[in-house]
Amino acid sequence: MAVSASLVKELRERTGLGMMECKKALAETDGDIDAAIENLRKASGLKAAKKADRTAAEGVVAAKVADDGSYGVLVEVNSETDFVARDAGFLAFVDSVVEKAFSAKAADVAAVNDEAMESTRQALVQKIGENIGIRRVSLIEADGGLVGAYVHSNNRIAVMVQLANGGSVELAKDVAMHIAAVNPQVVNPEDMPEEVVNKEKDIIKAQPDMEGKPEQIVEKMMTGRINKFLKENSLVEQPFVKDPEITVGALVKKEGASVVSFSRFEVGEGIEKKEEDFAAEVAAQVAASKGNA
């Protein structure tokens, strides 16, 4: 049967899919719009699976903290392109992930990505045409202290901080903003993992100015440079980004507080993004269209 333009329009509005895809779905069901939607939903799993090997290295991070500062969550949700990361449907999905993580006090992706969430994700993949993924979730509980957060204006960096023994929401936000800007590795120098320190020592030993020097001189120089490395990469030792005359540790101590822990998410960090030139991308699309013909 011929499919009317009004049916195609209605299916597009209800699914957000393209005109040709909607027309084909309606033709296959003889104009039964509910059956067409059901078939499209069944197909979404296949479509999502086909896109799963594409690198999702863009996206946004988001945070939500309880009004009383008792706990908070961070999430990172990835897309393939920055364009989709600004899409209203994608951002609505991110909001639903944050709300689910917050209400469930989720500490990992598994606690968020239940059957309903996965179904929503797959439907979004079908609608948008890109791989979408919930990459990570972080939970920090105050344990009698205070949790605060900062999300940078571009939604690409988010930080959560746990304070103890005092402080305020404003202080926690300031410390979180500093962490977003400076990216320390640990809270205190003694928190630095031994393997990181040993790796840094190997790097220092290999530097040209160490060659040929007596062992005691080398050790003295090594100690000085390791201490400098620890100071530069430990939150409490860093000059506060809003007032470099004071360290973050001194700032927090002034309010009778201390930093217990922090969590920092930056979109795409650690993901190796596949680079393709435009010609190769077009060729791949042409090949795919021939394969589907």
Curated annotation (Swiss-Prot):
One of its GO terms (molecular function) is translation elongation factor activity. Keywords: Cytoplasm, Elongation factor, Protein biosynthesis. It is found in: Cytoplasm. Residues 81-84 are annotated as: Involved in Mg(2+) ion dislocation from EF-Tu. InterPro entries: EF-Ts_dimer_sf, Transl_elong_EFTs/EF1B, Transl_elong_EFTs/EF1B_dimer, Transl_elong_Ts_CS, UBA-like_sf. Pfam families: EF_TS (PF00889). GO terms for cellular component: cytoplasm. HAMAP family: EF_Ts. Associates with the EF-Tu.GDP complex and induces the exchange of GDP to GTP. It remains bound to the aminoacyl-tRNA.EF-Tu.GTP complex up to the GTP hydrolysis stage on the ribosome. PANTHER family: ELONGATION FACTOR TS, ELONGATION FACTOR TS, MITOCHONDRIAL. Belongs to the EF-Ts family. This is Elongation factor Ts. It comes from Teredinibacter turnerae (strain ATCC 39867 / T7901).
